[in-house]
A protein has these predicted regions:
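Conserved Rossmann-fold NAD(P)-dependent oxidoreductase catalytic core, especially the SDR/UDP-sugar
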Residues: 27-68
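Non-catalytic, hydrophobic alpha-helical segments
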Residues: 89, 127, 131, 150, ...
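Mid/C-terminal beta-alpha module of Rossmann-like enzyme folds, strongest
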Residues: 128-133, 137-184
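C-terminal amphipathic/interface module of NAD(P)-dependent oxidoreductases
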Residues: 136, 180-215
Length: 215
């Protein structure tokens, strides 16, 4: 048997992350029936990585234990790893919903102001397929990495994505600078996905958002 866990914060403050991630992992880890499970798939986030100032991160990059929300997610990963064989999948920003936040923002005319922070993404269908791929590898007796960065092959500043979407949707953007937001600036390297034989349906956000717009 396998267990797939996709935790979410109960709220967006530190306590909400502690309850939604750390406490959830500790509760699961304490269950005696977990020993009958072959592998746990724990879906975390690339938020666990330390600020890279535009540099690259991969499965072995330093983790962020200074920010409370990220620290709660790191603690959750560690708790479930101690209890059972686990593959932690760390997705970048998951998209693909035709009514998703970025599309709605662009449709309202917001966005497009230049910025320097890189954005990392993975289409929701690719994330689901990756989870299935890991389970199939394990069933076949093949090696499954303990950690996987789930991101597509095109890290791009968010404002460029907004401008591309605006052109496709026929919308004029305000390009008014937004209030300063604390935004991580990193590029996620997901080369390990190819090494385990996984192929992205949407290798970049262009294919993914084009499909979402048509949906």
């Amino acid at each position: 048997d396998y267990i797939l866990v996709t935790p979410t914060p109960q709220s967006y403050d530190p306590m909400g992350y502690h309850k939604g991630f750390t406490e959830a992992a500790e509760l699961l880890a304490a269950q005696p029936w977990l020993l009958a499970c072959r592998r746990v798939i724990w879906v975390s986030s690339t938020r666990v990585y330390r600020e890279a100032e535009g540099g690259w991160v991969d499965e072995h990059s330093p983790l962020n234990v200074s920010e409370p929300q990220a620290r709660a997610m790191v603690a959750a990963e560690a708790a479930i790893r101690r209890a059972r064989t686990t593959t932690v999948i760390r997705p970048a920003g998951v998209y693909g919903d035709p009514q998703g936040m970025l599309i709605r923002r662009v449709l309202s005319g917001q966005g497009g102001a230049p910025g320097s922070s890189f954005g990392n993404r993975i289409h929701r269908e690719d994330l689901a397929r990756l989870i299935t791929h890991c389970l199939q590898l394990d069933e076949q007796g093949k090696a499954v990495p303990p950690t996987l960065v789930a991101a597509d092959e095109d890290t791009t500043p968010t404002y460029e994505v907004e401008r591309w979407l605006a052109q496709k949707l026929g919308v004029n953007l305000s390009e008014t600078p937004q209030q300063a937001i604390s935004r991580a600036n990193r590029q996620c390297r997901s080369a390990l996905l190819k090494e385990i034989g996984f192929t992205l349906t949407y290798p970049s956000w262009r294919e993914g958002y084009a499909a979402a717009i048509k949906a």
